[in-house]
A protein has these predicted regions:
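Residue-level marker of regulatory loop/turn positions in helix-turn-helix DNA-binding domains and
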Residues: 6-10, 41, 56
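Short alpha-helical DNA-recognition segment
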Residues: 25-51
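Short, basic-rich loop-to-helix N-cap that marks the start of a DNA-contacting helix
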Residues: 47, 54-69
Length: 83
């Protein structure tokens, strides 16, 4: 059943960003991910990643794209549309 985007609080990728970091070999810390995103030209800190993962911060489309590239995962997967 499709979920209504109007009922979602925070962001829809919070858990998947955390899981995506854990799936890396070796697992990636929030600091590692922030460093990688900064190297790719995005101003992202470990604190921001923490807030995203705790569903305390929204993620814009450009950030979602960069997170997917940094983690080597599709945007659809990060949004929970793929297993």
């Amino acid at each position: 059943m499709a979920r209504s985007l109007f009922l979602i609080k925070g962001n829809i990728c919070a858990e998947r960003v955390r899981l995506g970091r854990a799936m890396q070999k070796p697992p990636m810390t929030q600091e590692d991910l922030a460093r990688k995103l900064q190297f790719m030209g995005m101003d992202m800190t470990a604190l921001i990643i923490s807030r995203i993962e705790k569903n305390q911060r929204h993620v814009c489309d450009a950030e979602l794209l960069m997170l997917s590239k940094a983690l080597g995962l599709s945007m659809d997967w990060l949004c929970g549309n793929e297993d």
